[in-house]
Amino acid sequence: MYKFCTYLDELLHTSHAEDFLDLVSLGLIADVMDTRDFETQYYIQEGLKHVRNPFYLAMINKDGMHFKSGEIPLMNDVAWYVAPFINAVNRVGTVEEKIIIFEAMLDFKAYTQIPSTKRGCKGMMETLVEQACRVATKVKNRQNDLVDELLVVVEKIIKEQNLLDN
């Protein structure tokens, strides 16, 4: 993505590619790219130094993941506390949930005030990015529940077919 953005910058005589290094780092970390490659290391470190994307920033700062001013999140923070939530939305989220997450990544939409869908907050307003963080958490919990349900089925099959006796 970054290479494509730098190419567009060249064609259009602009300089916007650097603005997306945070998303480049998120993608590289989420895809578990080989960090022995110096170019990959560079993109990850530069992206983590300058997290600008509203949703990415909100996910880093949610639920006790608060960083002091100037503190840089670590790769493991993103790998364990951000990427799995986005992955869950992509895998088991509804179209509406995916749209909320996508729009929360857009600077011009992320901080729009919308009616809250949070339980007990009827009639209140919240930002799209706040709602998106809650939606991502809800979807991740739903994915965990699905995994737990399937594990029960798998364990039953293993027991019924004596598959541990091999």
Q: How would you describe each model-predicted region?
A:
Residues 2-3, 7:
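Short amphipathic alpha-helical face segments that pack within enzyme cores
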